[in-house]
Amino acid sequence: KFSIGIPAYKAKYLYNCIESILNQTYKNFELIIVNDASPEDLDTIVSRFNDERIIYSTNEKNYGAEEVIGNWNKCLSFATGEYFILMGDDDTLDKHYLEEFYKTIQEYPESNVFHCRSNIIDENSAIISLTQSWPQRESLLDNMWHRLNGFRQQFISDFVYKRNFLIENNGFFYNKLAWASDDITAYQAMRDNGIIHINKALLNYRRSPITISSSGSVELK
């Protein structure tokens, strides 16, 4: 079973995000949406979906960009699945995302972390570019070298983690503004058995004018 967590704040693309998850060909999952005390009307968007797999919670106080890791780990705290995915509220999944990861996990059950290629899309969902292909299996040191030298474009929703690994390591690595928190969490997960990669673009990662980037910084474009 997969648990997909959306730390939600922006309304603009949330419907599309949720719809892409509920349209998965692999059906054994739960969708956790944690509204980070958004000033936008997320309740109405979520209420349009009548699906018992949705768990919806609203924070009393906004974590904000500086403490965004708190909301990432809040999503994780609700999860009951064996594998966990953290989803950007403006990204979308290919309908075969979970099915492809499920098949790959069966081949490499010892691994703590899995990854896929991504389409980078614009505000109108047009594809701008495709991220690089990787080896099917890569060690921690190889991945770090390629990442630090600019040969690995990766985000957050393109990773699938073994939930027990995240729980045992106190969730996603804490840094203010989530600076490199996603990368450090992935490196920790790769330590023992590397990372397993699917060379198919299963995530649509949206480049928008204001977003929290994959390195945790606030991008203004």
Spans of model-derived segments:
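The conserved acidic donor/metal-binding loop of glycosyltransferases
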Residues: G88-T92, R117
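Short, well-formed alpha-helical segments that are part of the catalytic scaffolds
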Residues: K10-N23
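Acidic donor-binding segment of Leloir-type glycosyltransferases
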Residues: S20-K61
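Conserved nucleotide-sugar donor-binding catalytic segment
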Residues: I4, C116, W134-E219
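Glycine-rich, basic loop-to-helix element that forms the pyrophosphate-binding segment
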Residues: E60-A79
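Conserved donor NDP-sugar-binding/catalytic core segment of glycosyltransferases
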Residues: H96-L130
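Short aromatic/hydrophobic "clamp" motif used to bind/position activated sugar donors
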Residues: F84
